[in-house]
């Protein structure tokens, strides 16, 4: 009789980055986002699912090339692009004459306030290969916006992202939401060799999936020595159409870790000209707390002065004790966790966590990471 408890086949993971040419001091040997997307298209034999906020690839040669490749391959395999209901139709004129299924998803139908956006970014090819990360389906995500994600081939974990894609398709119909499966094979209590996905908002978690906020708080509360955090915003607020509510859950957990357990906290803020004023105030208050024996360091990642208004370090990650890594696509913001749809990558494999930590460390010591100047943020 065969062994019914077969070990899960181990899969390989690669870090994927967009490192803009303007960041000349950063030397990355990781797979580029542009090459990753081309590779996924080339691998496709049956179907491609892409979930992203918007499709705006035709802004530069690299983005146009990816769009043309998707259009070409759509005559041979099924291609689904799932975008947020509110996203602009930038590439739709080219897409509508192709075989691509272009689907608008209204996450707001899931709650009484009709609030919510599709913020996650992932690709699933043939239920075997995937990308998940901060790079959206925009031309500048391949060139001038600094992004980070994860790529894997021949990985059964891809099926879990496929399940998310099907859920978004059902939501797009705005009917029969009861049939949204919210399925997953792997989660916090049953991971795939140390890897699993977590989800937001909470009403898309179901019985088996893991709520992303629960993961974030669990990792912070478990921290014994270090927390390294690369973010675009840290907002202790939850916003609706008509109000703003104080939401200190994550910030309080960080402060407790530092004050009560002596954890060293480093925060790298992806700063740009559109940074939220409340996020600025939140980061400033953390920086002010780093006195005496309280080990808090905060830096802002700034592009060179001649950069464009939308140039930003959009890489989002959290590394705990060098043992756990959480790669995010959304911000640490109550509104994101409560209303918006996204999927995060969780890693308990120490070898791959080390590789993610090396990206944070490289960025932290780079000349673009500046100590916070209170007069400039």
Swiss-Prot record:
What's the protein called, per UniProt?
Answer: Envelope protein F13 homolog
Lipidated residue numbers (N-myristoyl glycine): 2
Q: Give the coiled coil ranges.
A: none
GO MF annotation list: catalytic activity
Disulfide pairs here are none
Residue ranges of the TM segments: none
Q: Which GO terms describe its cellular component?
A: host cell endoplasmic reticulum membrane; membrane; viral envelope; virion membrane
- Please give the PROSITE patterns that the UniProt record associates with this protein: PLD (PS50035)
Which compartments is it annotated to reside in? Answer: Virion membrane; Host endoplasmic reticulum membrane
Briefly state the protein's biological role: Envelope protein associated with the inner side of the enveloped virion (EV) membrane.
Q: Which CDD domains match?
A: PLDc_vPLD3_4_5_like_1 (cd09106), PLDc_vPLD3_4_5_like_2 (cd09107)
Keywords from the UniProt entry = Host endoplasmic reticulum, Host membrane, Late protein, Lipoprotein, Membrane, Myristate, Viral envelope protein, Virion
Describe the location of the PLD phosphodiesterase domain by residue ranges: 309-336
Organism, scientific name: Fowlpox virus (strain NVSL) (FPV)
